[in-house]
């Protein structure tokens, strides 16, 4: 396989990651991006690659096989930004896919939450793992520390459902 073919595959994978990542309650405030995305802007990687930046401010043009092999591009460079996710949310909303838009908004919020904390929250949300107070504390933490209002509402909703369905710690 030649370098051009591999580079093309890497670009395609990155393009798909940026256009598909983040599928999940009310959208957050309008995007702080300088762009307003419409369904005609999809896929961003093809139609507006200049709008797509990584968390380390790399552009799609930075993702070449040469840069990957020389460690100029790392796994950290591949993290999606909240701005890109919010642009995807705008596109979904423009396409009439409000639920998908909310999922992108929630994913945008989660970019501020450290991976270890996300795993802790995931485990805490499993049935019979947490008390209502513990879940409410998680919701407060998400809202106050990370400004993740959608995610906080999601955890509060889960807590209420767990009470109703007897899925809290000690209910089993």
Curated annotation (Swiss-Prot):
**Pathway where it operates:** Polyol metabolism; 1,2-propanediol degradation
UniProt record similarity statement? Belongs to the diol/glycerol dehydratase small subunit family.
Q: Name one GO cellular component term.
A: bacterial microcompartment
Q: How does it assemble?
A: The propanediol dehydratase enzyme is a heterotrimeric complex composed of a large (PduC), a medium (PduD) and a small (PduE) subunit.
EC? Answer: 4.2.1.28
Instruction: Please give the function described in this protein's UniProt entry.
Output: Part of the PduCDE complex that catalyzes the dehydration of 1,2-propanediol (1,2-PD) to propionaldehyde. Localized in the bacterial microcompartment (BMC) dedicated to 1,2-PD degradation. Expression of a cosmid containing the full 21-gene pdu operon in E.coli allows E.coli to grow on 1,2-propanediol (1,2-PD) with the appearance of BMCs in its cytoplasm.
Instruction: List the InterPro entries hit by this protein, alphabetically.
Output: Ppandiol/glycerol_DeHydtase_su (IPR003207), Prodiol/glycerol_DeHase__sf_su (IPR036091)
Supply one GO molecular-function term.
lyase activity
Which keywords does this chain's UniProt record carry?
Answer: Bacterial microcompartment, Cobalamin, Cobalt, Lyase
Stated name of the protein: Propanediol dehydratase small subunit
Give one Pfam family. Answer: Dehydratase_SU
Q: Name one GO biological process term.
A: propanediol catabolic process
**Is Lyase set as a keyword in this record?**
yes
- What reaction does this catalyse? propane-1,2-diol = propanal + H2O
Any coiled-coil ranges, and where?
none
Q: Does the keyword Lipid metabolism apply?
A: no
In which compartments does the protein localize?
Bacterial microcompartment
Which cofactors, by name? adenosylcob(III)alamin
Per its UniProt record, what Gene3D superfamilies does this chain match? Propanediol/glycerol dehydratase, small subunit (1.10.1510.20)
């Amino acid at each position: 396989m030649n370098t051009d073919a591999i580079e093309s595959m890497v670009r395609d994978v990155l393009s798909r990651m940026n256009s598909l990542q983040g599928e999940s309650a009310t959208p957050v405030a309008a995007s702080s991006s300088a762009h307003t995305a419409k369904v005609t802007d999809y896929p961003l990687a093809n139609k507006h690659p200049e709008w797509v930046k990584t968390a380390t401010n790399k552009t799609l043009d930075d993702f070449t096989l040469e840069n990957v092999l020389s460690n100029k591009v790392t796994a950290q460079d591949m993290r999606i930004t909240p701005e890109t996710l919010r642009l995807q949310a705008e596109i979904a909303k423009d396409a009439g896919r409000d639920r998908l838009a909310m999922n992108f908004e929630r994913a945008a919020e989660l970019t501020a939450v450290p991976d270890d904390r996300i795993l802790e929250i995931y485990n805490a949300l499993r049935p019979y793992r947490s008390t209502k107070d513990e879940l409410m504390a998680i919701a407060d933490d998400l809202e106050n520390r990370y400004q993740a209002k959608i995610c906080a509402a999601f955890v509060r909703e889960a807590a209420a459902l767990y009470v109703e369905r007897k899925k809290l710690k000690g209910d089993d």
